[in-house]
Amino acid sequence: MATVTEMPTDVVVVDDVKEVSTKSEKIIDEGIEKSSITDSKTETESRLDMHKLVAMFKKLNPLAKEFFPSYYDPKKNNQVAKANQFLPADDFETTKKQSGEEFDLDAKKDDNTRKRRNYSQGRRRLTGRISKAQREDSIRRTVYVSDIDQSVTEEGLAGLFSNCGQVVDCRICGDPHSVLRFAFVEFADDQGAHEALSLGGTMLGFYPVRVLPSKTAILPVNPTFLPRSEDEREMCTRTIYCTNIDKKVSQADVRNFFESACGEVTRLRLLGDQLHSTRIAFVEFALADSALSALNCSGMVVGSQPIRVSPSKTPVRPRITRPPSTN
């Protein structure tokens, strides 16, 4: 009779475990393989995208108009043709190599422009320092005089201070009929200004004058505007200098105001610009008495501003009429 042998159950279990393990390894290997394939595809696609991007950038023209900022004006830099011309990358490189001399010229122009700009800026700074030093020197040579009697003229005031040193300029300001008038007297050197301080309290007219060091310099008058002959000096006696004129007031309004208050106006020059809120005028009368009467108008309101009137140091010269151009 044949004998039957039974296999142990634990052996069967071990075989099943081995089989399951083998299947798991196959699945893992397949997953790794699929992942590798996916990664490879992604990397390939990324490289293709990068190549496309590089190719696209190569086709861009760096001198195209859209690459320049809004404030850049190609007309001023002779770049009109270059800014509006589109070139492929290869053609652009070829053109650049062929026109290397032209690019060098542009670089030289830019370099020269930069040098000129730096030179101009340095020159302005130097000029500014010189003018500041000159202004400070002028202030040291100037004294401020107040409480000037209405009968005192600039010539009389300069005569008083001429004993202290050479007087190079004298300017009386303020209402000519008020004791609140003041003046600036500039000397040729610091010593004259220093000695002038000792004249404080000196009776000039009916009032003692006060003399102090000035904090400002006298605004110089352009020598070309000063009278050049006796006739022009006589014109100055009939001319007044009017300031603080409302910008809304016209030249006709200024003329009508002074003619109705003082007398006939023969010439009038109304001046102004965008930087100042008010304007100035030079008014020449037919008679010197009219100019004296006009000095009383200082403080009167014309338009919406009180005007300031003082004797003029310069005549109102007639405008030069140029012949029409033949071109």
Swiss-Prot record:
<dbReference type="GO" id="GO:0005634">
    <property type="term" value="C:nucleus"/>
</dbReference>
<dbReference type="InterPro" id="IPR012677">
    <property type="entry name" value="Nucleotide-bd_a/b_plait_sf"/>
</dbReference>
<dbReference type="GO" id="GO:0003723">
    <property type="term" value="F:RNA binding"/>
</dbReference>
<feature type="domain" description="RRM 1">
    <location>
        <begin position="141"/>
        <end position="216"/>
    </location>
</feature>
<dbReference type="InterPro" id="IPR000504">
    <property type="entry name" value="RRM_dom"/>
</dbReference>
<feature type="region of interest" description="Disordered">
    <location>
        <begin position="97"/>
        <end position="132"/>
    </location>
</feature>
<keyword id="KW-0694">RNA-binding</keyword>
<dbReference type="InterPro" id="IPR034823">
    <property type="entry name" value="CID8-like_RRM1"/>
</dbReference>
<keyword id="KW-0677">Repeat</keyword>
<feature type="short sequence motif" description="PAM2-like">
    <location>
        <begin position="59"/>
        <end position="69"/>
    </location>
</feature>
<feature type="short sequence motif" description="Bipartite nuclear localization signal">
    <location>
        <begin position="114"/>
        <end position="125"/>
    </location>
</feature>
<dbReference type="Pfam" id="PF07145">
    <property type="entry name" value="PAM2"/>
</dbReference>
<feature type="compositionally biased region" description="Basic residues">
    <location>
        <begin position="114"/>
        <end position="127"/>
    </location>
</feature>
<feature type="domain" description="RRM 2">
    <location>
        <begin position="238"/>
        <end position="314"/>
    </location>
</feature>
<dbReference type="InterPro" id="IPR034825">
    <property type="entry name" value="CID8-like_RRM2"/>
</dbReference>
<dbReference type="Pfam" id="PF00076">
    <property type="entry name" value="RRM_1"/>
</dbReference>
<keyword id="KW-0539">Nucleus</keyword>
<feature type="region of interest" description="Disordered">
    <location>
        <begin position="308"/>
        <end position="327"/>
    </location>
</feature>
<protein>
    <recommendedName>
        <fullName>Polyadenylate-binding protein-interacting protein 9</fullName>
    </recommendedName>
</protein>
<feature type="compositionally biased region" description="Basic and acidic residues">
    <location>
        <begin position="97"/>
        <end position="113"/>
    </location>
</feature>
<dbReference type="InterPro" id="IPR035979">
    <property type="entry name" value="RBD_domain_sf"/>
</dbReference>
<dbReference type="InterPro" id="IPR009818">
    <property type="entry name" value="PAM2_motif"/>
</dbReference>
